[in-house]
Amino acid sequence: MGRYAREPDNAGKSCKARGSNLRVHFKNTCETANAIRKMPLKRAVAYLKNVTAQKECVPFRRFNGGVGRCAQAKQFGTTQGRWPKKSAEFLLQLLRNAESNADYSGLDVDRLVVQHIQVNRAACLRRRTYRAHGRINPYMSSPCHIELWLTEAESVPEAAKKPGKKTSAVEKSKKATAATH
């Protein structure tokens, strides 16, 4: 059992999970972890499934150099976002592990919230790529360590119901012109 960066305030109402030296990009995983922090467990699992299906994006706030813009990032108040599938799958595995730990400990799975999630850099793995004129360049990978714990909350906020589709001014004018013809 490894040491966690910090311990939960109420250890009896918490469950942990961690992964070490995971072969998944550190920067993508860091942004994905930041997106699910403080989310209820059920919402976090649904969100990560939506990321793999490209229905919701992960907002890139810190490691956003060269990241393209996407419309789905507007719901997070930013413009840049991506769909890091491998990071989402690794985090989904860890959440499922923590959920089974909670079930084993006798916690209420429906009231769990992602209280703490942290991604650290692991030791880089070194390979080489061969270039023109006999040169060799490094071909590095950036694995990471992930740790998280879920805490049983007093009450989990229900997902806000999405309001009906709003019609824009352009759509209203199209309907008005169609009605006159």
Curated annotation (Swiss-Prot):
UniProt-listed CDD domains: Ribosomal_L22 (cd00336)
Region (Disordered): 157-181
SUPFAM superfamilies: Ribosomal protein L22 (SSF54843)
PROSITE patterns to which the protein is assigned, alphabetical: RIBOSOMAL_L22 (PS00464)
Keywords: Ribonucleoprotein, Ribosomal protein
Gene Ontology process terms (BP): cytoplasmic translation
PANTHER family reported in the protein's UniProt record: 60S RIBOSOMAL PROTEIN L17
Protein name in the entry: Large ribosomal subunit protein uL22
UniProt gene name: RpL17
